[in-house]
Swiss-Prot record:
The chain crosses the membrane at residues 12-32, 114-134, 161-181, 196-216. Contributes to K(+)/H(+) antiport activity by supporting proton efflux to control proton extrusion and homeostasis in chloroplasts in a light-dependent manner to modulate photosynthesis. Prevents excessive induction of non-photochemical quenching (NPQ) under continuous-light conditions. Indirectly promotes efficient inorganic carbon uptake into chloroplasts. Pfam families: CemA. This is Potassium/proton antiporter CemA. Keywords: Antiport, Chloroplast, Hydrogen ion transport, Ion transport, Membrane, Plastid, Plastid inner membrane, Potassium, Potassium transport, Transmembrane, Transmembrane helix, Transport. Belongs to the CemA family. It comes from Chlorokybus atmophyticus (Soil alga). One of its GO terms (cellular component) is chloroplast inner membrane. It is found in: Plastid, Chloroplast inner membrane. One of its GO terms (molecular function) is antiporter activity. It is a multi-pass membrane protein. It catalyses: K(+)(in) + H(+)(out) = K(+)(out) + H(+)(in). GO terms for biological process: potassium ion transport.
């Protein structure tokens, strides 16, 4: 009995270490490959083969809006006396310097986006390979998670279920999904199309909610009917 417990403990600790090391390795690989290996290649391809500064229309709109905001702010500060009076030539030169600054920033952002695409693909390949090679460790972690879930009380299970549903498919979750999609599209250098974002926000949480309810009906209702009953009572 003691020997089996020690073996189980050893397997669990080893699997958790494997999981943590695996996550850290993927994150470090993504960062190193993006910054050191892939970015110089992306910079060469973008600067030598492309004449554009902006990688998509959304990035261009952000730069134009920032330049317009800077110009309006400069005019306002001059009018209220917080900045010295400038002649037309000096004013245009100041705006030009800001435009050059924005152009350089946008160009660097475009290069980063290209490097991010290839770095993410590389990380995905490593992730899949690690899953295939570490089936034993993953199975142990899965058993550990199942044991932890089964050890929870019905009220605790219901609390986490309600928390999960409210965060991901609740009434206010749409704003969070919008931010996540915009950050993801910007990370990959894709245009932040509002129609696509609104369509995703309108459909994906609904699909996720349907899948979750189906899981409760098909799986949780079999292994823990009392937890489902507690969930419905707490939800009401």
């Amino acid at each position: 009995m003691t020997r089996n417990w020690k073996v189980s403990k050893y397997q669990t600790v080893t699997s958790i270490k494997y999981f943590i090391s695996f996550i850290l390795f993927v994150l470090i690989t993504n960062h190193v490959s993006s910054r050191i290996l892939l970015r110089p290649c992306a910079e060469y391809l973008w600067n030598m083969r492309q004449t554009d500064i902006f990688i998509n229309s959304s990035q261009e709109e952000r730069a134009f809006l920032e330049l317009q905001r800077f110009e309006d702010k400069t005019r306002f500060e001059i009018l209220i006396g917080e900045a010295p009076q400038l002649n037309t030539q000096s004013f245009n030169k100041k705006i030009q310097e800001k435009a050059i600054e924005l152009a350089k920033y946008s160009n660097e952002e475009s290069i980063d986006s290209i490097a991010n695409v290839f770095a993410d693909l590389l990380s995905l390949c490593i992730f899949v390979l690690a899953l295939l090679l570490g089936k034993k460790e993953i199975a142990v972690i899965k058993n550990l998670v199942n044991t932890l879930i089964y050890s929870l009380t019905d009220a605790t299970k219901s609390f986490f279920i309600i928390l999960f549903t409210d965060i991901f498919v609740g009434f206010h979750s749409s704003h969070g999904w919008e931010i996540l999609i915009e950050v993801f599209l910007k990370h990959l250098g894709l245009p932040e199309n509002k129609d696509f974002i609104f369509l995703f926000v309108a459909t994906f949480p609904v699909v996720l909610d349907t899948v979750f309810k189906y899981w409760i009906f098909l799986y949780l209702n079999k292994i823990s009917p009392s937890a489902v009953a507690t969930f419905h009572n707490m939800n009401e």
